[in-house]
């Protein structure tokens, strides 16, 4: 299973030097998972970077189409409690901790795709196989 955080998922929809790595990792995995927060984060980032309304609508449509294939992990009380623990233990932001807490709920083994370097030590310590530009 491939758990994807928003830093990586966003690269699926924008031109970026990390896009080929993200696309390859997603193509190799038959099962994708992400926190419910990831979809909103990505769609808002695409809205903010869109050069036109048509561009934004096309990007949002692509996210909605792909999201049908994503196993969405809810950001509920259990997830938030675990995120608090992770954030406190590793000194990362709540948003970063939410992505890790969501991935931590998945059955192992989990490959964790992120471009956020702050998450890497925590993800490794949580037992995830890392998929990053540096891994």
Please describe what each predicted stretch is.
Residues 4, 33-34, 74, 94-97, ...:
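Short beta-strand scaffold positions
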Residues 61-90, 97-101:
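Acidic catalytic patch
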Residues 29-32, 68-71, 107-111:
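Short active-site oxyanion
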Residues 1, 39, 100-135:
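Acidic, PIN/NYN-like endoribonuclease modules and their adjacent C-terminal/linker elements
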Residues 1-37, 49-61, 128:
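Short, well-structured N-terminal submotif of metal-dependent ribonuclease cores
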């Amino acid at each position: 299973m491939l758990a994807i955080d928003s830093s990586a998922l966003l690269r699926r929809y924008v031109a970026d030097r990390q896009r080929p790595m993200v696309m390859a990792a997603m193509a190799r995995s038959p099962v994708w998972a992400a926190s419910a927060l990831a979809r909103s984060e990505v769609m808002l980032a695409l809205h903010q970077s869109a050069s036109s309304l048509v561009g934004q609508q096309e990007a949002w449509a692509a996210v909605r189409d792909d999201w049908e294939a994503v196993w969405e992990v809810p950001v509920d009380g259990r997830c938030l409690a675990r995120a608090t623990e992770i954030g406190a233990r590793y000194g990362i932001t709540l948003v970063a901790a939410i992505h890790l807490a969501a991935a931590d709920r998945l059955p192992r083994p989990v490959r964790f795709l992120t471009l956020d370097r702050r998450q890497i030590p925590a993800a490794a310590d949580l037992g995830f196989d890392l998929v990053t530009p540096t891994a």
